[in-house]
Amino acid sequence: MSHYIDLNSDLGESFGNYTLGMDSEVLNHVTSANVACGWHAGDPLIMEATVKMCKEKGVAVGAHPGYPDLMGFGRRKMAVSPDEARAYMIYQLGALQGFCNQYDVELQHMKLHGAFYNMACVTPDIADAVLDGLQAVNSKVRAMVLSGSYIAKEAERRGIPVIQEVFADRGYTEEGTLVPRTEEGAFIKDPQEALERVLMMVQEGKVVTNTGKTI
């Protein structure tokens, strides 16, 4: 059985007078990009420019919606209701879809950002609302979600195309979630170790957790 591995990166995080990241260089090495939608990062001009660059370099475009938390880069927990989560999705995906339409680019996928991503992995009513919002904007858009999570299983149940995501540079807990950034073992900094972990995840469907257990 053959596998297609998509190399993916978050992009479009600059805004106003602030330049973050090296987007044009990164685009030479990835096959898809998650474009910030203006709340945790990005702005309308950056969103448009990023879509154009992705088209020029043949990189698939995905939406990267987050919490309305520019100061915290969307990584802080927020008390969000299902209605709010659904509206957040429609608002941000709708904006990026508009730029994709302008340049005749397919909006291939959606990947949540930061605390929004983490919440949807473990909170069923938020995950349901996220998928409701996705389907309201474009039912053909794939859901890029944490492999084995609730939202991954619910998306598959609904018939939404799913991209099972694994991380090369992040640690995993025994529950299959990401180790919080504030805790030891959250990041894999050695390139060789990251490569070996990716190969295990892709070839064997397993990962070594922060406790040393293989799941």
Regions found by a protein language model. Name each.
Residues 5-9, 33-35, 61-65, 108-112, ...:
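Hydrophobic faces of well-ordered beta-strands that scaffold small-molecule active sites
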Residues 10-14, 36-40, 66-70, 113-117, ...:
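Active-site beta-loop-alpha junctions enriched in small/polar residues
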Residues 16-22, 41-55, 121-128, 147-158:
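Active-site-adjacent beta->alpha loops and helix N-cap segments on the catalytic face
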Residues 24-28, 49-62, 101-104:
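Acidic (Asp/Glu)-rich catalytic clusters
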Residues 148-209:
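Active-site rim beta-loop-alpha module in soluble metabolic enzymes
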